[in-house]
């Protein structure tokens, strides 16, 4: 019999890998109610514009699923004690709300009548799971202080549903204990969140950063950190393109001024060869100095004072270039123009041979064509 290795993780790894493979492609089309209470408005704008794909591993995806699996059990618990729960609309779908032309929305876990604390009052239902530490904080401080995003989410649902109370139910993932808390509708908070949502959807550029550098506590582990404080360029898709606009006439529509058409979600995710980064998203390393009607943009590289152009460099090449000092470099420009070279992902000066003369103007000639036999 073949001896077992000292430690086996193959089965667990395969399970997590399957979660990653089956995860929904791309980011969700709308700005979620669960996000709008986030402390950083810049984060929300970059998220709405798909500036960087969230990178969740299989374990995290399974953890999210565990939270979703708790919802039907809590509904069954409520019905078992005589509470009337409405968790589906007339079409059998989860209750869903949309706002700001369909670009903002969320799915409410349900509404309940007959809760022991107030049997005659309809409540918005919000279900969450938490580890022991977070659970203890919620019990001690309440949801508004310990989980302000959850509190804001319920304010939106109450405002959209026309209800003035919510019931917050949280399950301790370690002990299966349940914390229940009634929440009162705050009209000022609802209006603030709605105005914020409208500002994010219609804004042509993001808000300023929360901190002065990437070591600021709230920024330290943010996925947009390198775009806000370093030279990372955004991912290429229609939402990071200066030609696209979120329209406000319903159905979460986006339009493209370059191709004069409405964009499907799939088209938004793919982008096209005419993509041009929203200039401010390259503001850490480049400044737009000229733009013409032929979609030709000229930038000044802030690191080197050299100029570079789109279409010489595609948006994807700008994003893929790790060392942004390459953009506009004389040899890099010559290689691009004369030899139709391509900047690949992770490119930088360190990847080039040591004997290449990177200083001064260099003219690279096209290779001679081979003589025909």
Regions found by a protein language model. Give the residues of each.
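Metal-dependent nuclease catalytic cores that hydrolyze phosphodiester bonds in DNA/RNA
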Residues: 1-124, 131-133, 273, 281, ...
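A generic structural motif
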Residues: 111-115, 171, 257-259
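Metal-dependent nuclease catalytic regions and adjoining charged, substrate-binding loops involved
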Residues: 137, 141-151, 156, 160-255, ...
